[in-house]
Amino acid sequence: MSVLQVLHIPDERLRKVAKPVEEVNAEIQRIVDDMFETMYAEEGIGLAATQVDIHQRIIVIDVSENRDERLVLINPELLEKSGETGIEEGCLSIPEQRALVPRAEKVKIRALDRDGKPFELEADGLLAICIQHEMDHLVGKLFMDYLSPLKQQRIRQKVEKLDRLKARA
């Protein structure tokens, strides 16, 4: 397994729409494993393949405290959503920035697991929010897109400054 490079805004590759996975095979499973390795190394709770410049409909999530409840979503589809909630969200592609984003409180999805087996999942709370956040990435949408243009500009400037400082270090 290896840690992949996470794209940061304003990289336009984050805006690409991911294509469906045609076949879950050893290559896709390796991508899933590398994505988990990357997510854990970056201390995230979710990662979409788009964020690591792989434009296929793959998501990995682990919202557990012990980091031992891996969830793989290949070709996820949103079947139902209900209620309203929101928390301050962060994103590995928008480092050190957080903002309140409106989300559905509960979701029901259909996806394939790491072995290509179909399943359905009902989720609420943090898991539901994380699923929606990561599914947004698959269509080129970022949490900051829900914010006002002024807030988006401030976030872009802060991230660009942070990336410049890291490049000098």
UniProtKB/Swiss-Prot annotation:
Record family assignment: Belongs to the polypeptide deformylase family.
EC number: 3.5.1.88
Keyword set includes Signal: no
Keywords (A to Z) from UniProt: Hydrolase, Iron, Metal-binding, Protein biosynthesis, Zinc
Catalytic reaction annotation: N-terminal N-formyl-L-methionyl-[peptide] + H2O = N-terminal L-methionyl-[peptide] + formate
Function: Removes the formyl group from the N-terminal Met of newly synthesized proteins. Requires at least a dipeptide for an efficient rate of reaction. N-terminal L-methionine is a prerequisite for activity but the enzyme has broad specificity at other positions.
Name recorded for this polypeptide: Peptide deformylase
Highest rank taxon of the organism: Bacteria
Cofactor(s) of this protein: Fe(2+); Zn(2+)
Activity regulation statement: Inhibited by 1,10-phenanthroline.
Active site: 134
Keyword Iron belongs to the record: yes
GO biological process, alphabetically ordered: co-translational protein modification; translation
Binding residues for Fe cation: 91, 133, 137
Cellular component annotations (GO), alphabetically ordered: cytosol
HAMAP family in the record: Pep_deformylase
Entry's cofactor comment: Upon overproduction is isolated with 1 Fe(2+) ion per monomer, a Ni(2+)-bound form is as active while a Zn(2+)-bound form is inactive.
Gene assigned in the entry: def
Subunit (UniProt): Monomer.
Coiled-coil ranges from the UniProt annotation: none
Lineage, uppermost ranks: Bacteria, Pseudomonadati, Pseudomonadota, Gammaproteobacteria, Enterobacterales
An MF annotation (GO) of this entry: hydrolase activity
